[in-house]
Amino acid sequence: MLLLLYICCLFLKFILANVDLTFVEYAKLPSKYAELLANATNQQGVMLFSTGDIRIGAYNYLVNNVTEINNDTDAYLCQLLTGQYTTDCYIFDTNSDDKPETFNSSIHLLNSDLDPK
């Protein structure tokens, strides 16, 4: 019985350790980015990130590669977020009202917070 309890505790510890690592990674992002990545859904309400690996990939892209904002940046990040490469996804464009929106409307959170330097 003690052995079973010990195994259960190890299993829970392993699961919680993985969750903690994910939260540590998210803690490095500005809160609106982290919230967007964690809660992004498509128009049918399906989560865009099916695994933590894809979320971490999007996180790493945001942190390490967004130094110059252009259409390629939008297209690549859209590919990470939706799994499809498209030039009709304008995540970082500040004038997105003039362009088609193919991604979740909550993506506009990025527009006001991103300060490229």
UniProtKB/Swiss-Prot annotation:
Listed InterPro entries: UPF0321
Pfam families noted in UniProt: DUF2430
Entry keyword set: Glycoprotein, Signal
UniProt signal peptide: 1-17
Residues carrying covalently attached carbohydrate according to the record: 39, 65, 71, 104
Top-rank taxon: Eukaryota
Record-annotated membrane-spanning stretches: none
GO cellular component terms, semicolon-separated: cytoplasm
Similarity section: Belongs to the UPF0321 family.
Listed name of the protein: UPF0321 protein PJ695.01c
